[in-house]
Amino acid sequence: MATDDASFPWDQDSILSRDLLSALSSQLCYENLNRSCIRSPYSPGPRLILHAVFGFSAVLAVCGNLLVMTSILHFRQLHSPANFLVASLACADLLVGLTVMPFSMVRSVEGCWYFGDIYCKFHSSFDVSFCYSSIFHLCFISVDRYIAVSDPLIYLTRFTASVSGKCITFSWFLSIIYSFSLLYTGASEAGLEDLVSALTCVGGCQLAVNQSWVFINFLLFLVPTLVMMTVYSKVFLIAKQQAQNIEKIGKQTARASESYKDRVAKRERKAAKTLGITVAAFLLSWLPYFIDSIIDAFLGFITPTYVYEILVWIAYYNSAMNPLIYAFFYPWFRKAIKLIVTGKILRENSSATNLFPE
């Protein structure tokens, strides 16, 4: 029997409207809030892959840098001013893996921020703090390597534990004060009030930085970078000269003091090479992001979201790279990892273990 549409308590328009509202609500971060951000979710397959890739990087950053810190702090043979700088750098990378990457993973993959406005600012502040802390640490490490390679016999009297402590304090204090004051005073958003108002919604966590502060941020990255590049160019020139001198001396009978100096210089050159690779990896990871931030600020935020996310995660992955570099180039680190993983560091006097091959 045919039925008339008017006999139903709803019509087709109301059905379509309700279906449309249902579809829209499923694309909102918070379905029952009018000011909710709109989600742009991935399909299940890519979402699973992205969670796995980003999650693995966070776990690697935490576990790898924890191994670096444990190795340096536990084994007395590694207690040196230079290694304390490396341990502090590992701490910055560890904190990126703990306080930044997991939350950024959810925001990047799910398209929403579910952790509240308060932690949004903390998260952004941590992100900026640990980035600049790493830059300052690497800058001081490059200066340390220059002194060690240029004059290894006097190095220990110049770069003491006290000097290392001051470098570590400066790196952390300046980066934390700068990032938190910049974001919590609202200075970074001055002149962008209309943009911030348009972007503000429940479930969003976007950092808006005006042109002036983007330029200052870039300078804070560029100046230490130029210092590192200048210092390491000198380090490799000195290393090349020392290698040539050792080759000449090897053809003659060397005094015991000369032989000792050569051994020390060789060890310092290897350390400088490894840390030079660490610096290069950092620059390759972060430079694209900083260049894009300059382009965005002065050309009207033209970077597509997916490109921005790629650049951010390339930078984040740097926090997981340093332990891999150490493991590849440092036999002592591989030996320390083995002792830690097997639980042998719990044995009595394990801190006195010899990690360096004869």
UniProtKB/Swiss-Prot annotation:
The chain crosses the membrane at residues 48-68, 84-104, 122-143, 167-187, 213-233, 275-295, 310-333. It is found in: Cell membrane. Glycans are attached at residues 34, 210. It is a multi-pass membrane protein. One of its GO terms (cellular component) is plasma membrane. Residues 1-47, 105-121, 188-212, 296-309 are extracellular. Keywords: Cell membrane, Disulfide bond, G-protein coupled receptor, Glycoprotein, Membrane, Receptor, Transducer, Transmembrane, Transmembrane helix. GO terms for molecular function: trace-amine receptor activity. The keyword Transmembrane helix applies. Residues 69-83, 144-166, 234-274, 334-358 are cytoplasmic. Belongs to the G-protein coupled receptor 1 family. In addition to the well known disulfide bond common to G-protein coupled receptor 1 family, trace amine-associated receptors (TAARs) contain an unique disulfide bond (Cys-37-Cys-201) connecting the N-terminus to the extracellular Loop 2 (ECL2), which is required for agonist-induced receptor activation. This is Trace amine-associated receptor 7e. It comes from Rattus norvegicus (Rat). The gene is Taar7e.
